[in-house]
């Protein structure tokens, strides 16, 4: 499959004002790629717009849980940008808590953001992507779409579902001008864990301790991860591991699909402890 030239069209990035999405936007803007950035954070969009002054960037404030708002934003994007040849879905959040600590409302909230927000923007943008001579969709899944740890049920559920959506859509679009792939990051220092949510039933200090323990395990720099995600998009890759931990866990889950947790549990012990009080 011929590589995609991202400078010959517009790349739409969800979660484009923060974390991984913002880093991808910086690197693409430096290459001269036109961008449409979607985020719910108005202030962060203002900051990234100022940072990328001189680049071809449009920004769109959208809550991805609102389907009508998503489709309206995509309509604005297609009116502003003549050719859209890439979508990179980075928007998402995390949720810490055991099944007994989490409410149904908390779990549904994360699924709405991580899964249905991804589905909604992909569906809305698909006609514009089909109109391009060649286009690619990159969905950010997670290493937790390969291995499901304790204490991260809603996050793992949402990311496994993103993986399934991405694979099924890739098969539906096989033979068309639009290719689809998923990337599986692990250990990227974006702050998603430190700024993520936790069950209301958890002591905030305990949640902060668990989040800090998880963040301490992260070693991949956002700039390196962003460069790999951009390469995967250009190459129209179907499946890309991002970070050393992702590659290791990918192998582990293949070799020991029913017992990988025995290996993962020890290093994650403090990161999933949401019950031990702080003395």
Question: Across the structure, where does each feature detected by a protein language model lie?
Answer:
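Substrate-binding pocket helix/loop in short-chain dehydrogenase/reductase
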Residues: 98-99, 103-109
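Active-site helix of classical SDR
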Residues: 122, 158
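Canonical Rossmann dinucleotide-binding motif of NAD(H)/NADP(H)-dependent dehydrogenases/reductases
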Residues: 2-35
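Conserved glycine-rich Rossmann-like NAD(P)H-binding loop of the short-chain dehydrogenase/reductase
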Residues: 33-47
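The beta1-alpha1 cofactor-binding region of Rossmann-like NAD(H)/NADP(H)-dependent oxidoreductases
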Residues: 42-43, 61-72, 104
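Residue(s) in the substrate-gating loop at a strand-loop-helix junction
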Residues: 142
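SDR active-site lid
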Residues: 175-244
């Amino acid at each position: 499959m011929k590589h995609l030239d991202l400078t010959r069209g517009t790349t739409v990035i969800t979660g484009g004002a923060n974390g991984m999405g913002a880093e991808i936007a910086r690197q693409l803007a430096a290459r001269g790629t036109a961008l449409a950035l979607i985020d719910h954070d108005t202030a962060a969009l203002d900051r990234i717009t100022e940072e990328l002054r001189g680049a071809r960037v449009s920004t769109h404030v959208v809550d991805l849980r609102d389907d009508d708002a998503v489709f309206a934003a995509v309509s604005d994007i297609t009116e502003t940008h003549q050719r859209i040849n890439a979508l990179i879905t980075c928007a998402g959040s995390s949720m810490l808590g055991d099944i007994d600590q989490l409410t149904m409302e908390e779990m549904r909230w994360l699924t709405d953001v991580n899964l249905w927000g991804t589905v909604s923007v992909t569906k809305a943008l698909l006609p514009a992507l089909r109109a391009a001579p060649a286009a690619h969709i990159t969905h950010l899944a997670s290493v937790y779409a390969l291995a499901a740890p304790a204490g991260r049920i809603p996050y793992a559920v949402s990311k496994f579902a993103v993986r399934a959506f991405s694979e099924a859509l890739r098969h539906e679009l096989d033979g068309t001008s639009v290719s689809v792939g998923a990337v599986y990051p692990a250990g990227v220092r974006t702050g998603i864990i430190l700024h993520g949510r936790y069950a209301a039933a958890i002591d905030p200090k305990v949640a902060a301790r668990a989040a800090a323990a998880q963040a301490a395990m992260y070693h991949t720099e956002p700039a390196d991860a962003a460069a790999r995600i951009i390469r995967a998009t250009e190459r129209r890759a179907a499946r890309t591991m991002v970070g050393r931990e992702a590659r290791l866990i990918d192998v582990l889950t293949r070799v020991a699909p029913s017992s990988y947790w025995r290996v993962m549990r020890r290093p994650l012990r403090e990161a999933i402890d949401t019950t031990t009080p702080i003395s």
